[in-house]
Amino acid sequence: MYQGGFIMKLDKKQRFSIRKYAVGATSVLIGFTFSAQVVSADGLTPAPKATETLQAVPDSPQASEAPIQDKEEKLVKQADKTIKEEVKTEKDTVNTVVPKTDNAVAPVVTEHASPAPTTESENTTQVEKSGESANTEKKNEPATPAVLAPTTERATQTNEKLAKKKIVSIDAGRKYFSPEQLKEIIDKAKHYGYTDLHLLVGNDGLRFMLDDMSITANGKTYASDDVKRAIEKGTNDYYNDPNGNHLTESQMTDLINYAKDKGIGLIPTVNSPGHMDAILNAMKELGIQNPNFNYFGKESARTVDLDNEQAVAFTKALIDKYAAYFAKKTEIFNIGLDEYANDATNAKGWSVLQADKYYPNEGYPVKGYEKFIAYANDLARIVKSHGLKPMAFNDGIYYNSDTSFGTFDKDIIVSMWTGGWGGYDVASSKLLVEKGHQILNTNDAWYYVLGRNADGQGWYNLDQGLNGIKNTPITSVPKSDGATIPFIGGMVAAWADTPSARYSPSRLFKLMRQFANSNAEYFAADYESAEQALNEVPKDLNRYTAESVAAVNEAAKVIRSLDSNLSRAQQDTIDQAIAKLQEAVSLSLIHI
């Protein structure tokens, strides 16, 4: 942080570094033995009113001890001016957000674009208002629109909700999870009606290794065994997990196939340019000099220096390697992009990247934010070249709602986890939709950090997550600016900020169950018990009376004729049919 006696502090407020990471939007609806109907998730869904989502304040805030310099004062004033100018455009907000066609907006990013100012504003998550888009949509309706029968309309709404992605995210980058543990999570995901497992394999640690890890970059090829040793050591330097270092390629392939058989998709994450401690350590082992971002003498342990061409080239080649493996196995690949150098900048990383525009030649990264946009778009291009959909966390995308630096690839699905906090001024979900991005709601109101199992045990504790789920529905997208935000699904997340903390399956499953129960209309009903009940009907009915056989057959027929697109909110329909079948079988045994 110190260089030549100059200390940068971008605001007067205390800065907090909130950890999250989480991610994805899926592939498959939960399968069911009976024939399923095809449903669509493309429509806009009005969001109900909900309580305001509380923004995170970590349990161990890092207060700045540095005095405020004149340069920071000017930066804050410039930010305030920007806010006042932007407020004028919010008066005529349309409640239902649709992507805009940008004709004269920011240029496609190049290495010569111009940065933008930092804003300082307190952001709290705003919750969508239900049904407010209805009046605006009616303008385009025919004079005598066709009206669906009520039952058909309800069925359509149910199918649209069931088509949304329901994802559970596991931080298997910081902490090692065994294949058996992950399969158990997949089983529970199937049982509760989820569609996908979001698996962070690269998040601070890197805990997934391919058979061939050779990397070609910087005019040379790094041998596979050398890369493996370097990454394994890099992960152990981050946290030497006694339970294991990484998953192998065969284990991952088996896991993907296991999930597919259950109707569950898998969404991998390899995070960069931040949260890549192990990769940075590995690069140094392989002879790449100074790969870490350095902020006025303070080195980030987890973030790559975007000005280090060798380090950036190696990272891109590594992402390309993993994307090639996941091609045709998964649908979405999360490239991360969150929290740039928060550890070295006191959570001011994005502001630091944008600062050079206003204070050139003062040591800030030259065109730093333009380089970040170019980097993000390069990763998106790499992922798309393998037939995958890129996804990334929201905080760095159009930071400070500034679009003058360049344009992010619209194909990047935005995992919207935060509305920001004091001095961490992220773009609204409304703006991101207008810029053409799909939104996966990853609201941090639903977060749980392993080991923080009750109130009083730190931010993102389990009680906080459970209460957040109860009070914040799946439709409540962070920082909506009063608009109804179209979203492709929701993701609940379990993080391992303290990787040594014990993993408790029962606590994770409690979180997953609460998310499903609180949003029951969006989750598929559990048909497994119905299938089991049918399988338990005696095969030989010759010993039973004709009346008993008829009763059993009729009860079984009711189960087989059940609508295969029932939601978890309609689980009683299935359970009652099962109870009647079991009762019929029991009475048959009595009458033998």
Per-region residue spans from a language model:
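Aromatic- and acidic-residue-enriched carbohydrate-binding clefts of CAZyme catalytic domains
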Residues: 161-163, 204-260, 277-310, 341-366
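Sec-dependent N-terminal signal peptides of Gram-positive bacterial secreted proteins and lipoproteins
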Residues: 19-40
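Substrate-binding groove of N-acetylhexosamine-processing glycoside hydrolases
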Residues: 312-316, 320-326, 331-332, 362-526
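Low-complexity, acidic Ser/Thr/Pro-rich repeat tracts that form intrinsically disordered stalk/linker regions
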Residues: 2-7, 40-160
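Conserved small/polar residues in nucleotide/adenosyl-binding loops
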Residues: 590-592
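Amphipathic, non-membrane alpha-helical rod segments
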Residues: 534-588
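An active-site-proximal structural segment forming one wall of the substrate-binding cleft
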Residues: 252-273, 302-334
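Catalytic domains of carbohydrate-active enzymes, especially glycoside hydrolases
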Residues: 181-204
